[in-house]
Amino acid sequence: MGEGILKNKSMNFAIRIVNLYNFLKETKQERIMSKQILRSGTSVGANIREGQFAESPADFIHKYSVAQKECSETLYWLELLNKTNYITTEQYVSLDTDCTELMKMITSSIITRKKSLSLTPNH
């Protein structure tokens, strides 16, 4: 899978998360969960970018694994925001779908990199 696609999707997702943060802060007057989802949702792309310039395959796997965990945390905050009526089901489903797709792409990249490591001599 092209790393450029993942880079672009994670940036677009981060933009959506920033917009959600602004909506929650300004419209719903919510401050705690919005900061949590802002941190985790924008961290996904930041870790992907760091991983793309990793110093070693192990560093790549580590950065992408952190991005994977941040996706998981973001999914938690999205679900909580939906279940507490801060976001609509439509907003939730749309963001959840994007985040889940990102997580699958990240997981696929990790698996591919691990497989390539196992095929490389001396690893």
Feature annotation, model-predicted:
Residues M1-H123:
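Short, C-terminally biased terminal segments at protein or domain edges
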